Amino acid sequence: MSFDKQNLIWIDLEMTGLDPEKERIIEIATIVTDKNLNILAEGPVLAVHQSDELLNKMNDWCQKTHSENGLIERIKASKLTERAAELQTLDFLKKWVPKGASPICGNSIAQDKRFLVKYMPDLADYFHYRHLDVSTLKELAARWKPEILEGFKKENTHLALDDIRESIKELAYYREHFMKLD
């Protein structure tokens, strides 16, 4: 185990939709890497129970995607509240990274942060105020060197742990091919 302020916390949420005022968190996963993107540990992968009423209000894309990937079944079987999932995630992170040290890392991470602020505020407060958003590099590559985008393809399972693993691989790809740091 390597508790280090240089470690990076990667997080992904699946939600019932995109508006934190109306939608809720349905899955959370975390991974801790070292500063060079080597995976040190995978945190708990937690399906968060939500009511059938809320699940039935999800749009067609969410209904189809989360049915096909098995997440809806896991949500219905789960007894975990958002608070319980938040506490389990914090317990994991406290073993790896001091509070306030790591930026929140992921793809389109500002969206996840909006939900954390509303439904998991203690977890939101655990991060440094900065973001490490892989989608920023994707947007820059699309504008400055679009051919770079051809070399990395995502599977898009829309399961939180898979999405984090892909984000880490994607950043490593951009580091090597776009930023040319390797």
Swiss-Prot record:
UniProt keywords, alphabetically: Cytoplasm, Exonuclease, Hydrolase, Nuclease
Annotated GO CC locations: cytoplasm
Keyword Cytoplasm: yes
A single GO BP: DNA metabolic process
Compartmental location: Cytoplasm
Enzyme class, UniProt record, top EC level: hydrolase
Pfam families: RNase_T
InterPro entries noted in UniProt: Exonuclease_RNaseT/DNA_pol3 (IPR013520), Oligoribonuclease (IPR022894), RNaseH-like_sf (IPR012337), RNaseH_sf (IPR036397)
EC number: 3.1.15.-
Catalytic residues in the record: 129
Keyword Cytoplasm: yes
Domain of life per record: Bacteria
Domain Exonuclease: 8-171
GO molecular function, one term: 3'-5'-RNA exonuclease activity
Record-stated family: Belongs to the oligoribonuclease family.
The protein's role, per its UniProt record: 3'-to-5' exoribonuclease specific for small oligoribonucleotides.
Alphabetical list of PANTHER family matching this protein: OLIGORIBONUCLEASE, MITOCHONDRIAL
Protein name in UniProt: Oligoribonuclease
Taxonomic source organism: Haemophilus influenzae (strain ATCC 51907 / DSM 11121 / KW20 / Rd)
